[in-house]
Amino acid sequence: MTMTLHTKASGMALLHQIQGNELEPLNRPQLKIPLERPLGEVYLDSSKPAVYNYPEGAAYEFNAAAAANAQVYGQTGLPYGPGSEAAAFGSNGLGGFPPLNSVSPSPLMLLHPPPQLSPFLQPHGQQVPYYLENEPSGYTVREAGPPAFYRPNSDNRRQGGRERLASTNDKGSMAMESAKETRYCAVCNDYASGYHYGVWSCEGCKAFFKRSIQGHNDYMCPATNQCTIDKNRRKSCQACRLRKCYEVGMMKGGIRKDRRGGRMLKHKRQRDDGEGRGEVGSAGDMRAANLWPSPLMIKRSKKNSLALSLTADQMVSALLDAEPPILYSEYDPTRPFSEASMMGLLTNLADRELVHMINWAKRVPGFVDLTLHDQVHLLECAWLEILMIGLVWRSMEHPGKLLFAPNLLLDRNQGKCVEGMVEIFDMLLATSSRFRMMNLQGEEFVCLKSIILLNSGVYTFLSSTLKSLEEKDHIHRVLDKITDTLIHLMAKAGLTLQQQHQRLAQLLLILSHIRHMSNKGMEHLYSMKCKNVVPLYDLLLEMLDAHRLHAPTSRGGASVEETDQSHLATAGSTSSHSLQKYYITGEAEGFPATV
């Protein structure tokens, strides 16, 4: 009995000693495992061994299979407040630790299974918002990572930041390298699928241009032929899209020689055609049709016009063949110049040129598709501009002089004999110098002259009927065709896209200067008529009166409509009938057939 009591006392003392030794580590600060990775990476994979250090300094190596059988403490979450050690380790035994002489084959883990995470560490169950990250290659959208965790180790935090920065830089450099290899469509700026018809273009623009060059190109812009063509609005206006295709350099023969053939490309072409057919009835075309009134979307009875089916080379050939012959003046070198003699020479030459101008206009592609009234109207508005651009073109090879005819070459001093003629001479010489500096070609000259004819009176039609609107639409389409021919000539000459745009703008700006010269010349000629300096010939006189009729300004306080009505009652009808007479007599005299 005594032995038994002694044994119990010794056992209790030994037990208290063991408790003191084992509970000593509990007085140290609580160990927290830093989480350097998202929670999804904290749980161990069965193939990766791990090593954990415990307060006693012992190291245990185990894998996830052993960890699955390990005893887990603190099922309600890790305590983060002072005085919570007892709650963390429970009340069974000595803080939940097994005896020292019976080490468990499974190591201890201070980890939580996924269902038991604390609320503030619970990962989001939905998509994390996106944020912008500033990289050297620009602002890019990236998916936000998991929420930030408490990291007591500042070195580990800096190391993690350096790793993320290095990863971001690598991604940014890869994005920049891939961006350098990306090519965009020259028409709509979408991603290019290849080199089609001479330029880098997408599949949609390639299919659209393919359909257009096969004859389906009778498009009409519902606005001002200046629609924006980009990825989102390329289907809204087919006319402006086709124009931009030509502007960027697309051409029928612009196919790469290293292009492969075979079944793969045949299947690809079929897919392109299917996509192209889907574009015809797109919502963008329906919106464009509904936005504009029906008079602008009239049925095109002239859509089968021969002029609209000509290629660029055929258009140039037709315009060159239509050029009038060179006429000689009645100049007598033995007679000195006077105001009356010089004006007589010039007006006689202009009157004879007008007869040939009528024949030339009838051979301009698309001109004879208009009504006779509209043909006369365009000629009445543009005749002096056409004469002046021809004079400037002939004078290119004679700096400082104007070649009115092969036997009539005048300089500025000779023009002083006519009052008010020097100012007009100076403007003509300046325009000729500009043509010479630009090295204007004959093909470009005939295109510019045709543009003057068709564009001069298109906005001054006296009627606004449906027929008149149809005529205007036809004129605009022929003008677009001639403009495309100009661009084709520049591309054929080897000019870059930027040089083509610059040259086209410079040429069209010269036309406004020629219009200004024509107005000055018309005023001077009318003043000569009022002074009775020289008798004017019938056709020239009627052309002058017709131009005064179509002038937009009113005289003597009368309105424009009243002025037009008074002229129509007097000279207007006579002028039109007289000019129509020259049409009939010109055909009877055997002029060449029209286009």
UniProtKB/Swiss-Prot annotation:
Changing residue 118 to E: Enhances transactivation activity. Insensitive to PPP5C inhibition of transactivation activity. Residues 154-165 have a biased composition (Basic and acidic residues). It is found in: Nucleus; Golgi apparatus; Cell membrane. Changing residue 537 to A: Reduces PELP1-mediated activation of transcriptional activity. Changing residue 264 to I: In a breast cancer sample; somatic mutation. Phosphorylated by cyclin A/CDK2 and CK1. Phosphorylation probably enhances transcriptional activity. Self-association induces phosphorylation. Dephosphorylation at Ser-118 by PPP5C inhibits its transactivation activity. Phosphorylated by LMTK3 in vitro. Glycosylated; contains N-acetylglucosamine, probably O-linked. Residues 1-184 are annotated as: Modulating (transactivation AF-1). Its main location: nucleus. The modification Asymmetric dimethylarginine is found at residue 260. The keyword ATP-binding does not apply. Disulfide bonds: none annotated. Keywords: Activator, Cell membrane, Cytoplasm, Disease variant, DNA-binding, Glycoprotein, Golgi apparatus, Lipid-binding, Lipoprotein, Membrane, Metal-binding, Methylation, Nucleus, Osteoporosis, Palmitate, Phosphoprotein, Receptor, Steroid-binding, Transcription, Transcription regulation, Transmembrane, Ubl conjugation, Zinc, Zinc-finger. Residues 311-547 form the NR LBD domain. The keyword Phosphoprotein applies. Residues 147-174, 259-282, 553-573 are annotated as: Disordered. InterPro entries: Est_rcpt/est-rel_rcp (IPR024178), Estr_rcpt (IPR001292), Estr_rcpt_N (IPR046944), NHR-like_dom_sf (IPR035500), Nucl_hrmn_rcpt_lig-bd (IPR000536), Nuclear_hormone_rcpt_NR3 (IPR050200), Nuclear_hrmn_rcpt (IPR001723), Oestrogen-typ_rcpt_final_C_dom (IPR024736). Residues 311-595 are annotated as: Transactivation AF-2. Changing residue 6 to Y: In a breast cancer sample; somatic mutation. GO terms for cellular component: chromatin; cytoplasm; cytosol; euchromatin; Golgi apparatus; membrane; nucleoplasm; nucleus. PANTHER family: KNIRPS-RELATED PROTEIN-RELATED (PTHR48092). This is Estrogen receptor. It comes from Homo sapiens (Human).
